């Protein structure tokens, strides 16, 4: 049944293609310069094949087409290389908020951990030392100015 339908659609598409392709230049309709005889034939054949369902003729949806048909042995390839999908990966859920710590403490801890892992330093590391920090630094001996 599907082959008869496909043959009928093919014959109709060829007849329509020949009808469109045999237009004379003296006809009243304007000529489209972008498509010649092959453009017209290709357009009609494409429409006719698209109407005859995808890849398998009229019976493709019922299982009788070229893709799903039981009588075509060339489409039935052995599936020896089939692999099962990988097992699902265990996702480590990150705790965004722990009840023991406040969000500010958690953020501070996260920043310290991030700096430790990546080797980055805080912004204070790059700042100049203040006068109080310089006074706190113990020298090698007594301060010669005051002693």
Swiss-Prot record:
Free-text tissue specificity from the UniProt record: Highly expressed exclusively within the dorsal esophageal gland cell during syncytium formation in host plants.
Compositional bias (Basic and acidic residues): 125-137
Secreted recorded as keyword: yes
Domain of life of the source: Eukaryota
Protein name (record): CLAVATA3/ESR (CLE)-related protein 4C
Keywords: Apoplast, Differentiation, Glycoprotein, Host cytoplasm, Secreted, Signal
Described purpose of this protein according to its UniProt entry: Mimics host plant CLE extracellular signal peptides that regulate cell fate. May play a role in the differentiation or division of feeding cells (syncytia) induced in plant roots during infection.
